[in-house]
């Protein structure tokens, strides 16, 4: 009876260890093979076009609860790059509180991204009608993060809790927006967390192997 219990404990430990080792190995592989030189995992370039004044993401509620005195910026960093396909026009990319951005685009015609399909790649946009022209985005003070100018433009943002949305516009706030954008995310805790899982998996595997050995 004791050997049976030891065998069951050993088998359970081996299964748990396998999960920990696979999880840790996967995180380390992603951190090594899928990140660029700055540690970001990037999307493919995405082309977006509208005849309206802006293209926005839907509002996203971000909630981060970190135990202990850990800087939120170490959890994840968002990086968005964009370039106007008209080489003579500057691009504006901005991240702001959803309420602030909604107020800025009130009564302004813009398109909102409502769905992204990976295979085959497809972006679904919904048009919000309006009759007003927006004020120049670079003159606004509510942006959490932004970048603008001719050629490729990039901003990075250490993720914080709140309700946010992203907007893509022409720098001069004119209608007819056509841009190419890339989104990247960096998760610094991925490597140490993956390493911790591997260590824990190794310890549990030793325990499981010992139990199985005692049961034989």
Model-assigned labels for residue ranges:
Residues 33-184:
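Extracytoplasmic/periplasmic regions of membrane proteins
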